[in-house]
Amino acid sequence: MCANNKSALKRAQIAERNRVRNKTYKSSVKTLMKNYLSAVQAYAANPTPESKQEAQTRLAAAYSRIDKAVKRGILHPNNGARKKSRLASKLKPIEQTA
């Protein structure tokens, strides 16, 4: 850190702390999204009520984590809405054909 005074040093420390905290949240959002997408692929390959329920459960978990990230200011509200919309659009056409 190349801070020239006390307040700049403190701001740099806070920024680093927040960066690490935000990174863990963003990482968990991405992980839950990937888990959901894999469940959707499994449901598309073998459309059973159990696989549909699994996909819906994982969708709810991803929605919850995205909403919490938005609430805490880690994701912009529009970014969170876009992620949720894209997740929902993956399952919708498969449900209608099955």
Swiss-Prot record:
SUPFAM superfamilies the UniProt entry points to: Ribosomal protein S20 (SSF46992)
GO cellular-component term (any): cytosol
InterPro entries reported for this sequence: Ribosomal_bS20 (IPR002583), Ribosomal_bS20_sf (IPR036510)
Gene Ontology molecular-function annotations: small ribosomal subunit rRNA binding; structural constituent of ribosome
Chain segments annotated as transmembrane: none
Region (Disordered): 76-98
Pfam hit, one: Ribosomal_S20p
Key word Ribonucleoprotein present: yes
Biological process per Gene Ontology, one example term: translation
Keyword list, A-Z: Ribonucleoprotein, Ribosomal protein, RNA-binding, rRNA-binding
Physiological role: Binds directly to 16S ribosomal RNA.
Family: Belongs to the bacterial ribosomal protein bS20 family.
HAMAP family cross-referenced by the UniProt entry: Ribosomal_bS20
Protein name: Small ribosomal subunit protein bS20
